[in-house]
């Protein structure tokens, strides 16, 4: 009988310890309060820092507590152009400047935003990776919703009270820089999760993978596998509608969809 394969080991149920002990903390907006709903709060960026395991830099923003004599420190995903000492304004009456946080209803159509909330007060969900941004498409004042174009190209309708940061997330173009050597990839994934190096199935022994074994590296059977295949067999092209290169009409249709 074969062994438990890699795809089964990384599934739910096994012991997993997240690599979070060296991270700076969760990056999110301030907790939504009376000050942000009705006016604005002023904060200052004390430092821009690197968070291990995250592509985008983080900005540590210090706010004065609205009621008590103390300061509040928050970690924001840094927008392109943020700098140490910059004042950041959060709230309904904040100005349209890069780094400021406003509700979507206060942001004009066509504006570039990032770290957009999905529900009012969830402190930021969409467009948070390095170089990402979302575009405000339209507002619907009748039902209080806003249509937003996400980095994937999908268009999503969210409540107009959801907050967003003006600008694009810093660190764009990070993935275009070549890794150059295995050591760089080692350090990159060491702070993320155990997913590197990734050995191909055809390079394994037959006991370790359905694609393993043989006198030369080949799968030996169809690489497509049915949707209801059991774990351990479900590797390769799962429930593929088609395989191979796009040719003829299919290629033209795909090219037209990419342009749109």
Swiss-Prot record:
GO cellular component term of the entry, any: cytosolic large ribosomal subunit
Keywords, sorted A to Z: Cytoplasm, Ribonucleoprotein, Ribosomal protein
A Pfam family recorded for this sequence: Ribosomal_L2_C
SMART domains xref list: Ribosomal_L2, Ribosomal_L2_C
Keyword Hydrolase (UniProt): no
Region named Disordered: 1-24
Compartment annotation: Cytoplasm
Superkingdom as given in the UniProt entry: Eukaryota
Primary location: cytoplasm
GO-annotated molecular function: RNA binding; structural constituent of ribosome
One BP term from GO: cytoplasmic translation
Family to which the UniProt record says this protein belongs: Belongs to the universal ribosomal protein uL2 family.
Identification of the protein by name: Large ribosomal subunit protein uL2
Lineage of producing organism: Eukaryota, Viridiplantae, Streptophyta, Embryophyta, Tracheophyta
